[in-house]
Amino acid sequence: MKIYDCIIFNGENSILEIRLNELNESVDHFVIIEFGETFTGIKKKQKINKELLKKFDDKIRYYFIDTNISEIDPWKREGFQRNQIMKGIEDADHNDIIMISDVDEIPNLKDLNLSNIGNKVYAFSLFHSMNK
């Protein structure tokens, strides 16, 4: 069983560094997708700190995708971008664990027993409500 940690990267280098260091012992592959435009279609330059990736080079699967999809609405564009994660998990087996989250949503895998998770799909959503 392998664990894939998959994210869409949008320039959060300091948070990415924390994530990579925190999950390094538990994760087999880090799949990082970066686009040449934002979810809203604004063109942007590559922002990843390649020096940061060197320490984790044997685990990193980094893809910079510079394609013009600005003709579609932001929700479809975000969906298209998230679907590009498939590039980094093509060799995944049915027993592998694939985590997809935002860069700043860092799971604590050290306390979990993932060996008995089985063939199930788990979805976790975190919502913070501000009660007055």
At which residue positions do the language-model features occur?
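N-proximal low-complexity "stem/linker" segments adjacent to membrane-targeting elements
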Residues: 1-25
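Short loop->beta transition adjacent to catalytic acidic/histidine clusters or analogous donor-positioning motifs
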Residues: 2-4, 24-38, 57-61
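Short His-Asn-centered micro-motif
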Residues: 5-11, 33-34, 100-103, 124-126
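A short acidic (Asp/Glu
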Residues: 15-20, 41-44, 107-115
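Short, well-ordered alpha-helix to beta-strand connector turns
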Residues: 27, 57, 95, 118-119
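Conserved beta-strand scaffold positions in the cores of enzyme catalytic domains, especially
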Residues: 30, 62-64, 121-123
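Active-site-proximal specificity loops/subdomain of glycosyltransferases
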Residues: 35-100, 109-111
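Conserved catalytic core of nucleotide-sugar-dependent glycosyltransferases
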Residues: 75, 105-132
